[in-house]
Swiss-Prot record:
The keyword Manganese does not apply. SUPFAM superfamilies: P-loop containing nucleoside triphosphate hydrolases. It comes from the Bacteria. PANTHER family: TETRAACYLDISACCHARIDE 4'-KINASE (PTHR42724), TETRAACYLDISACCHARIDE 4'-KINASE, MITOCHONDRIAL-RELATED (PTHR42724:SF1). This is Tetraacyldisaccharide 4'-kinase. The keyword Lipid metabolism applies. ATP binds at T55, V56, G57, G58, N59, G60, K61, T62. Keywords: ATP-binding, Kinase, Lipid A biosynthesis, Lipid biosynthesis, Lipid metabolism, Nucleotide-binding, Transferase.
Protein backbone atom coordinates (compact mmCIF):
# COMPACT_ATOMS: atom_id res chain seq x y z
CA UNK A 1 0.00 0.00 0.00
CA UNK A 2 2.63 2.52 1.07
CA UNK A 3 4.79 1.81 -1.98
CA UNK A 4 1.89 2.79 -4.24
CA UNK A 5 1.73 6.13 -2.43
CA UNK A 6 5.41 6.70 -3.16
CA UNK A 7 4.67 7.13 -6.84
CA UNK A 8 1.80 9.58 -6.47
CA UNK A 9 0.99 12.69 -4.48
CA UNK A 10 -2.12 12.71 -2.33
CA UNK A 11 -3.23 13.87 1.08
CA UNK A 12 -2.38 10.40 2.43
CA UNK A 13 1.33 11.09 1.91
CA UNK A 14 1.16 13.92 4.41
CA UNK A 15 0.21 11.52 7.18
CA UNK A 16 3.86 10.43 7.06
CA UNK A 17 5.31 13.96 6.94
CA UNK A 18 6.54 14.03 10.58
CA UNK A 19 8.39 10.76 10.06
CA UNK A 20 9.89 11.99 6.79
CA UNK A 21 11.13 15.13 8.56
CA UNK A 22 12.73 13.01 11.28
CA UNK A 23 14.29 10.74 8.64
CA UNK A 24 15.70 13.78 6.84
CA UNK A 25 17.22 15.09 10.06
CA UNK A 26 18.79 11.77 11.00
CA UNK A 27 20.25 11.07 7.55
CA UNK A 28 21.67 14.59 7.29
CA UNK A 29 23.27 14.37 10.73
CA UNK A 30 24.65 10.92 9.99
CA UNK A 31 26.30 11.98 6.75
CA UNK A 32 27.71 15.11 8.37
CA UNK A 33 29.16 13.00 11.19
CA UNK A 34 31.09 10.90 8.67
CA UNK A 35 32.28 13.89 6.67
CA UNK A 36 33.41 15.69 9.82
CA UNK A 37 35.26 12.66 11.15
CA UNK A 38 32.95 12.21 14.13
CA UNK A 39 32.16 8.74 12.84
CA UNK A 40 35.16 6.81 11.55
CA UNK A 41 35.35 5.61 7.95
CA UNK A 42 37.74 3.32 6.11
CA UNK A 43 39.97 4.38 3.22
CA UNK A 44 40.90 1.39 1.05
CA UNK A 45 44.41 1.15 -0.46
CA UNK A 46 42.82 0.68 -3.91
CA UNK A 47 40.16 2.71 -5.75
CA UNK A 48 36.56 2.10 -4.66
CA UNK A 49 33.62 2.40 -7.05
CA UNK A 50 30.16 2.50 -5.46
CA UNK A 51 27.03 1.56 -7.39
CA UNK A 52 23.83 2.51 -5.60
CA UNK A 53 20.64 4.50 -5.71
CA UNK A 54 18.72 7.06 -3.71
CA UNK A 55 15.37 5.29 -3.96
CA UNK A 56 13.97 2.16 -2.37
CA UNK A 57 13.40 -0.78 -4.71
CA UNK A 58 15.11 -2.38 -7.66
CA UNK A 59 16.69 -0.10 -10.21
CA UNK A 60 19.10 -2.36 -12.07
CA UNK A 61 22.26 -2.08 -9.98
CA UNK A 62 23.36 -5.69 -10.44
CA UNK A 63 23.55 -5.52 -14.28
CA UNK A 64 25.58 -2.33 -13.86
CA UNK A 65 27.97 -4.11 -11.49
CA UNK A 66 28.35 -6.98 -13.96
CA UNK A 67 29.09 -4.49 -16.74
CA UNK A 68 31.76 -2.80 -14.60
CA UNK A 69 33.44 -6.11 -13.75
CA UNK A 70 33.64 -7.05 -17.42
CA UNK A 71 34.89 -3.61 -18.47
CA UNK A 72 37.61 -3.45 -15.83
CA UNK A 73 38.73 -7.04 -16.43
CA UNK A 74 39.13 -6.39 -20.15
CA UNK A 75 41.12 -3.24 -19.32
CA UNK A 76 43.63 -5.30 -17.32
CA UNK A 77 42.36 -4.69 -13.81
CA UNK A 78 41.57 -7.31 -11.19
CA UNK A 79 38.25 -6.13 -9.74
CA UNK A 80 36.58 -7.48 -6.63
CA UNK A 81 33.00 -6.96 -5.50
CA UNK A 82 31.79 -6.31 -1.95
CA UNK A 83 28.20 -6.47 -0.77
CA UNK A 84 26.14 -6.47 2.39
CA UNK A 85 24.79 -9.88 1.39
CA UNK A 86 21.09 -9.15 1.87
CA UNK A 87 18.98 -12.27 2.30
CA UNK A 88 21.90 -14.45 3.35
CA UNK A 89 23.46 -15.53 6.63
CA UNK A 90 27.08 -16.53 6.25
CA UNK A 91 28.96 -18.78 8.71
CA UNK A 92 31.18 -15.79 9.51
CA UNK A 93 32.01 -12.30 8.29
CA UNK A 94 33.71 -11.20 6.18
CA UNK A 95 32.82 -14.13 3.93
CA UNK A 96 34.58 -14.92 0.67
CA UNK A 97 32.37 -16.65 -1.89
CA UNK A 98 33.46 -19.98 -3.41
CA UNK A 99 31.90 -22.32 -6.01
CA UNK A 100 29.67 -24.06 -3.45
CA UNK A 101 28.39 -20.88 -1.79
CA UNK A 102 24.59 -20.68 -1.68
CA UNK A 103 22.25 -17.70 -1.74
CA UNK A 104 21.18 -18.68 1.79
CA UNK A 105 24.75 -17.99 2.92
CA UNK A 106 25.76 -14.94 0.90
CA UNK A 107 22.56 -13.54 -0.60
CA UNK A 108 21.23 -13.94 -4.13
CA UNK A 109 22.93 -10.95 -5.76
CA UNK A 110 26.50 -11.75 -4.61
CA UNK A 111 26.09 -15.38 -5.72
CA UNK A 112 24.76 -14.23 -9.10
CA UNK A 113 27.74 -11.90 -9.56
CA UNK A 114 30.23 -14.58 -8.53
CA UNK A 115 28.73 -17.24 -10.80
CA UNK A 116 28.37 -14.90 -13.76
CA UNK A 117 31.78 -13.17 -13.55
CA UNK A 118 34.01 -15.46 -11.56
CA UNK A 119 35.66 -12.48 -9.90
CA UNK A 120 36.39 -12.37 -6.15
CA UNK A 121 33.24 -11.48 -4.17
CA UNK A 122 33.03 -10.94 -0.41
CA UNK A 123 30.11 -10.06 1.84
CA UNK A 124 29.99 -8.41 5.25
CA UNK A 125 27.68 -6.03 7.12
CA UNK A 126 30.77 -3.88 7.62
CA UNK A 127 31.87 -3.58 4.02
CA UNK A 128 35.32 -2.33 5.02
CA UNK A 129 36.04 -5.82 6.38
CA UNK A 130 35.07 -7.33 3.03
CA UNK A 131 37.33 -4.86 1.22
CA UNK A 132 40.29 -5.72 3.44
CA UNK A 133 39.76 -9.43 2.80
CA UNK A 134 39.69 -8.99 -0.99
CA UNK A 135 42.79 -6.80 -1.02
CA UNK A 136 44.83 -9.00 1.33
CA UNK A 137 43.78 -12.48 0.15
CA UNK A 138 42.79 -11.98 -3.49
CA UNK A 139 45.09 -9.18 -4.63
CA UNK A 140 42.34 -7.10 -6.21
CA UNK A 141 43.33 -3.65 -7.47
CA UNK A 142 39.88 -2.04 -7.65
CA UNK A 143 36.76 -2.52 -5.54
CA UNK A 144 33.16 -2.36 -6.74
CA UNK A 145 30.69 -1.86 -3.90
CA UNK A 146 27.24 -3.16 -4.79
CA UNK A 147 24.45 -1.04 -3.29
CA UNK A 148 26.58 0.98 -0.90
CA UNK A 149 25.79 4.61 -1.67
CA UNK A 150 24.57 5.33 1.87
CA UNK A 151 27.25 3.17 3.53
CA UNK A 152 29.50 6.11 4.43
CA UNK A 153 31.68 3.99 6.71
CA UNK A 154 33.45 3.04 3.47
CA UNK A 155 35.14 5.92 1.67
CA UNK A 156 34.80 5.92 -2.09
CA UNK A 157 36.47 7.45 -5.12
CA UNK A 158 33.72 7.10 -7.73
CA UNK A 159 29.96 6.96 -7.22
CA UNK A 160 27.25 5.91 -9.66
CA UNK A 161 23.52 6.14 -9.08
CA UNK A 162 21.32 3.78 -11.09
CA UNK A 163 17.81 5.14 -11.63
CA UNK A 164 14.71 3.46 -12.99
CA UNK A 165 14.05 5.45 -16.15
CA UNK A 166 10.28 5.03 -15.90
CA UNK A 167 9.60 5.40 -12.16
CA UNK A 168 12.51 7.80 -11.63
CA UNK A 169 12.22 9.47 -8.17
CA UNK A 170 8.54 8.75 -7.64
CA UNK A 171 6.81 11.64 -5.90
CA UNK A 172 10.19 13.14 -4.97
CA UNK A 173 9.72 12.91 -1.21
CA UNK A 174 11.83 11.24 1.45
CA UNK A 175 10.80 8.03 3.19
CA UNK A 176 8.19 7.22 4.32
CA UNK A 177 6.35 9.97 2.38
CA UNK A 178 8.11 8.84 -0.77
CA UNK A 179 10.76 6.41 -1.99
CA UNK A 180 13.86 8.59 -1.46
CA UNK A 181 16.67 7.49 0.85
CA UNK A 182 18.35 10.86 0.34
CA UNK A 183 17.25 14.12 -1.24
CA UNK A 184 17.48 14.58 -5.00
CA UNK A 185 20.37 17.03 -4.50
CA UNK A 186 22.55 13.98 -3.78
CA UNK A 187 22.50 13.23 -7.52
CA UNK A 188 24.68 16.28 -8.18
CA UNK A 189 27.49 14.79 -6.11
CA UNK A 190 28.00 11.52 -8.03
CA UNK A 191 30.12 10.92 -11.13
CA UNK A 192 27.10 9.83 -13.17
CA UNK A 193 23.41 9.07 -12.94
CA UNK A 194 22.72 5.96 -15.02
CA UNK A 195 19.19 5.77 -16.38
CA UNK A 196 17.96 2.19 -16.69
CA UNK A 197 15.32 2.13 -19.42
CA UNK A 198 13.01 4.99 -20.25
CA UNK A 199 14.61 8.10 -21.70
CA UNK A 200 17.77 9.51 -20.12
CA UNK A 201 17.91 13.23 -19.54
CA UNK A 202 20.76 15.27 -21.07
CA UNK A 203 22.92 15.00 -17.94
CA UNK A 204 22.33 11.24 -17.48
CA UNK A 205 23.85 8.08 -18.98
CA UNK A 206 21.47 5.78 -20.83
CA UNK A 207 21.59 2.10 -19.90
CA UNK A 208 19.56 -0.64 -21.56
CA UNK A 209 19.24 -4.29 -20.63
CA UNK A 210 19.76 -6.69 -23.52
CA UNK A 211 18.07 -10.08 -22.97
CA UNK A 212 19.97 -13.23 -23.90
CA UNK A 213 18.54 -16.65 -24.81
CA UNK A 214 16.76 -18.48 -22.02
CA UNK A 215 18.85 -20.88 -19.96
CA UNK A 216 17.69 -23.92 -18.08
CA UNK A 217 17.83 -23.38 -14.33
CA UNK A 218 19.21 -26.87 -13.66
CA UNK A 219 21.56 -27.46 -16.61
CA UNK A 220 22.29 -23.90 -17.78
CA UNK A 221 21.71 -25.01 -21.38
CA UNK A 222 20.07 -22.54 -23.76
CA UNK A 223 16.80 -23.25 -25.55
CA UNK A 224 13.83 -21.68 -27.29
CA UNK A 225 10.61 -21.88 -25.26
CA UNK A 226 7.30 -21.46 -27.06
CA UNK A 227 3.64 -21.61 -26.10
CA UNK A 228 2.09 -20.51 -22.83
CA UNK A 229 4.49 -19.94 -19.93
CA UNK A 230 4.37 -18.80 -16.32
CA UNK A 231 6.65 -16.12 -14.90
CA UNK A 232 7.92 -15.33 -11.42
CA UNK A 233 10.16 -12.62 -10.05
CA UNK A 234 11.51 -11.99 -6.56
CA UNK A 235 13.22 -8.67 -7.30
CA UNK A 236 12.83 -5.05 -6.30
CA UNK A 237 10.40 -4.20 -9.11
CA UNK A 238 8.85 -7.34 -10.68
CA UNK A 239 6.70 -5.50 -13.28
CA UNK A 240 9.87 -4.56 -15.19
CA UNK A 241 10.70 -8.25 -15.67
CA UNK A 242 7.16 -9.23 -16.61
CA UNK A 243 6.93 -6.40 -19.13
CA UNK A 244 10.22 -7.45 -20.71
CA UNK A 245 8.84 -10.96 -21.29
CA UNK A 246 5.71 -9.56 -22.91
CA UNK A 247 7.80 -7.30 -25.16
CA UNK A 248 9.77 -10.36 -26.30
CA UNK A 249 6.54 -12.05 -27.33
CA UNK A 250 6.15 -14.64 -24.58
CA UNK A 251 2.57 -15.74 -23.89
CA UNK A 252 2.66 -15.29 -20.13
CA UNK A 253 -0.26 -17.03 -18.45
CA UNK A 254 0.59 -16.38 -14.81
CA UNK A 255 2.71 -13.59 -13.31
CA UNK A 256 3.75 -14.14 -9.70
CA UNK A 257 5.71 -11.49 -7.80
CA UNK A 258 7.66 -12.29 -4.65
CA UNK A 259 9.45 -10.03 -2.20
CA UNK A 260 13.01 -9.03 -3.01
CA UNK A 261 15.58 -11.50 -1.59
CA UNK A 262 12.77 -13.86 -0.53
CA UNK A 263 13.76 -17.42 0.33
CA UNK A 264 11.68 -19.79 -1.78
CA UNK A 265 9.82 -22.89 -0.63
CA UNK A 266 10.43 -25.75 -3.05
CA UNK A 267 7.11 -27.50 -2.38
CA UNK A 268 5.13 -24.30 -2.88
CA UNK A 269 6.86 -23.51 -6.17
CA UNK A 270 6.48 -27.09 -7.43
CA UNK A 271 2.75 -26.96 -6.76
CA UNK A 272 2.23 -23.52 -8.26
CA UNK A 273 4.36 -23.95 -11.39
CA UNK A 274 3.83 -27.57 -12.39
CA UNK A 275 1.68 -27.13 -15.50
CA UNK A 276 3.64 -24.83 -17.83
CA UNK A 277 7.26 -23.84 -18.46
CA UNK A 278 8.38 -21.28 -15.88
CA UNK A 279 10.57 -18.27 -16.67
CA UNK A 280 12.30 -16.43 -13.83
CA UNK A 281 15.06 -13.88 -13.34
CA UNK A 282 18.70 -14.90 -13.11
CA UNK A 283 18.67 -13.62 -9.54
CA UNK A 284 15.87 -16.04 -8.66
CA UNK A 285 17.56 -18.91 -10.49
CA UNK A 286 20.50 -18.97 -8.08
CA UNK A 287 18.02 -19.75 -5.29
CA UNK A 288 16.08 -22.40 -7.24
CA UNK A 289 18.85 -24.41 -8.89
CA UNK A 290 18.90 -27.21 -6.31
CA UNK A 291 15.19 -28.01 -6.64
CA UNK A 292 14.28 -26.74 -10.11
CA UNK A 293 12.02 -28.73 -12.40
CA UNK A 294 13.19 -29.64 -15.89
CA UNK A 295 11.08 -26.94 -17.57
CA UNK A 296 12.22 -24.01 -15.44
CA UNK A 297 14.19 -21.31 -17.26
CA UNK A 298 15.83 -18.00 -16.45
CA UNK A 299 16.41 -14.92 -18.57
CA UNK A 300 19.95 -13.49 -18.44
CA UNK A 301 20.29 -9.80 -19.25
CA UNK A 302 23.37 -7.76 -20.12
CA UNK A 303 23.72 -4.03 -19.49
CA UNK A 304 24.64 -1.86 -22.45
CA UNK A 305 26.15 1.58 -21.87
CA UNK A 306 27.78 4.14 -24.20
CA UNK A 307 31.40 3.61 -25.23
CA UNK A 308 32.18 7.22 -24.34
CA UNK A 309 31.08 6.57 -20.78
CA UNK A 310 33.36 3.52 -20.52
CA UNK A 311 36.30 5.55 -21.86
CA UNK A 312 35.61 8.33 -19.38
CA UNK A 313 35.46 5.90 -16.47
CA UNK A 314 38.73 4.18 -17.39
CA UNK A 315 40.45 7.56 -17.73
CA UNK A 316 39.17 8.59 -14.29
CA UNK A 317 40.34 5.33 -12.77
CA UNK A 318 43.78 5.66 -14.36
CA UNK A 319 44.08 9.16 -12.93
CA UNK A 320 43.11 7.94 -9.47
CA UNK A 321 45.69 5.16 -9.53
CA UNK A 322 48.38 7.53 -10.80
CA UNK A 323 47.60 10.02 -8.05
CA UNK A 324 47.82 7.28 -5.43
CA UNK A 325 51.10 5.98 -6.85
CA UNK A 326 49.61 2.60 -7.78
Amino acid sequence: MIEKLWYQRSWLNWLFAPFAALFALLTTMRRYAYRAGIFSSYRAPVPVIVVGNITVGGNGKTPMVLWLVELLTKAGYKPGVVSRGYGGKAPHYPYLLHPETTAAEAGDEPVLIYQRCGCPVAVAPKRAKAVQLLVEQCGVDVIICDDGLQHYALQRDIEFVVMDGERRLGNGWLMPMGPLRETASRLRQVMAVVCNGGQARPDEIQMSLQPAPLRNVRTNHTAVVSGAVDAMAGIGYPPRFFNSLLKQGYAVNQQVAYADHQAFNAAELHQRFAQRPLIMTEKDAVKCRDFALDNWWYLPVTAQLPEKFATRLLAQLKELRHGAGL
